[in-house]
């Protein structure tokens, strides 16, 4: 011990550099851990809010939400304590008149009276054609407000913001909630009757009593 202390006294610069390197490595690990956790949260906060017990996808989707395609007949075939239809699609929007300021988003098509409907921190739930509720990051980072209109890239559809929710991110993109009917127009460029609408998943709370053979069970840890 005496020799070690004596060596450190005579080589202060060398040991200071060693301590500095160890500190920088520890800081880098801390920084990367925080970054990874933040990205993981932004990848699925909207999903966590569902508090779902099961997410049913098509059996050919390989567990991927955006690759799943279901019909309303599939939805009706599921017998469960509580269920909700979900349609999802990534997209790009921009404020009307500001096409150069494009924003990556994730569209969620839902029914406003089902449990997938988001909590509101401002405004109201959508109820008319073209109305949407969006994550509040679009207000904080992009300056959007209730009443603003959004254009959808690749579509003639115009969306009107009527409410804001919080902690609604999916695949590191803010979520825009809309009716299933509006979603069909954006996704398929046509209005579809209720019975012909396409969805990506059936989200279940509680016990699932009956599931068709073409559906695949995903646990609540779905990412």
Name every feature range the model reports, one short phrase each:
Residues 137-177:
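Mid-to-C-terminal secondary-structure elements
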Residues 164-223:
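Mechanotransmission and gating elements of multispan inner-membrane complexes involved in transport
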Residues 65-69, 104, 117, 128, ...:
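Solvent-exposed, non-transmembrane alpha-helical starts
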Residues 110-118, 134-148, 183-188:
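Short, solvent-exposed hinge/capping segments at secondary-structure junctions
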Residues 75, 80-127, 177-180:
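The feature marks short, hydrophobic/small-residue-biased sequence motifs that occur predominantly
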